[in-house]
């Protein structure tokens, strides 16, 4: 709207978020400006607070408000099993199954040469340090079952030391799907039915 530049700016910012197209951005903007005006200061404060305090866990790269996230601080995790995921949302999806008791490493993405995302963007140095820990017995690659997710798992498998079991979550997760949208039961079965990566 040419006569409301601040709304145009809001729409443009919302469109930069994944999954929000031009029409959705416009609807959200109208809703906030017309029906939910009292929500806008609260949203602004929540954004500022999150921006100020949320950081990346020093051990696994998950989102946290402390140097270590709750998973890494827990004394009840099996430190011999490391599950590598693409995003904090994927970590949460696996945690919500109640099946996995090991530790995590969050890549914050996947390899995608066409998008200019190479190994350096995936915190490989930090992952390599985790893979070098002496108590590690198994690495589970729980990257999304997409071409990029498969390529990422295959590439990272080459970094795993000899003697450490390498597995991939089972195909109960639909090909082309994303972990954060898979139901708990399917994701739990996929974790239980994981396979060795070289099979």
Curated annotation (Swiss-Prot):
Protein keywords: DNA damage, DNA recombination, DNA repair, Metal-binding, Zinc, Zinc-finger
Superkingdom, natural source: Bacteria
InterPro entries linked: DNA_Rcmb_RecR, Rcmb_RecR, Rcmb_RecR_Znf, TOPRIM_dom, TOPRIM_RecR
Function summary: May play a role in DNA repair. It seems to be involved in an RecBC-independent recombinational process of DNA repair. It may act with RecF and RecO.
Zinc fingers typed C4-type, residue spans: 57-72
Species this protein is from: Acidithiobacillus ferrooxidans (strain ATCC 23270 / DSM 14882 / CIP 104768 / NCIMB 8455)
Family recorded in the similarity comment: Belongs to the RecR family.
Cross-referenced HAMAP family: RecR
GO biological process annotation, one example: DNA repair
A Pfam short name: Toprim_4
Name of the molecule in the record: Recombination protein RecR
GO molecular function, one term: zinc ion binding
SMART domains: TOPRIM
NCBIfam families the UniProt entry points to: recR
Segments forming domain Toprim: 80-174
